[in-house]
Structure formats: structure tokens, C-alpha cells
Amino acid sequence: MNNKEIGKLGEDFTVEFLSSRGFIVLERNYKVSFGEIDIIARKGDILIFVEVKTRRNLDFGMPVESVSFEKQNRIKKIAEIYVKNKQLRFKEIRFDIMSIILSPKGEVLNWEYLPNAF
């Protein structure tokens, strides 16, 4: 299983997680020239940008630890572009992280959803 496949499994799990909790997924893999946002969703008057980090082991630490300050700032800039381009208005904009650990077979062993992560 390559990194792209691992990432897709994590994103698929996260979309299912969000949908089952009443979120409406608006976009997946929203790209601009300098990066992307994995998932953009809404729930009521809240617009949520979700960074999904998926790993098969903890050799490099917990998945959430790889969302650096630089990565957070890049996501915020992409979010600004998204809101401006779509001309959206929400009472709240939130940045969440989904951290997932997979088994060697690609099954979700552990996950943690962090609302308002940054």
C-alpha cells in the first residue's frame, strides 16, 4: 500500500465519520497552486476545514504531530482563498484534524478527531 492509498483510506474514513455526525462534505482535496485541503465540510453555520493524517505505524510519531505550524498557516491561506472564491459567509470557520492509525491491512486501528485543532 503506497502513501496515496493510505491517504485515501484515511480520507474515506473521515468523510464517513463526518457524514454520520451530520456534517455535509462540500469538497475533497481542494487544490490551489501551493497546497490542498483534504476535506471541507459544513455543519449548520460552521465551515470546517479538515486535515487528515493517516499512518500505518508510529515510527515517526502520532499523525497529528506532522501538522506543523507552517502547514497550519498554509491551510489557513487556502481556506481564505476558498471562502473568497465561493463567496461564502459562515458564523464560524474551524480547522480540525483527523489522526488515524491503520493496520498493515489498511484497517483503522485507532483514530482521534480534534475539532478546533488550530
UniProtKB/Swiss-Prot annotation:
Where would one find the signal peptide in this protein? none
| GO molecular function terms attached to this record | nucleic acid binding
The UniProt entry, under CDD domains, shows: PoNe_Nuclease
Give a Pfam family name. Answer: UPF0102
To which protein family does this belong?
Answer: Belongs to the UPF0102 family.
Give the matching HAMAP family: UPF0102 (MF_00048)
**Name of protein:** UPF0102 protein Dtur_1530
Q: Which organism is it from?
A: Dictyoglomus turgidum (strain DSM 6724 / Z-1310)
Organism lineage reads as:
Bacteria, Pseudomonadati, Dictyoglomota, Dictyoglomia, Dictyoglomales
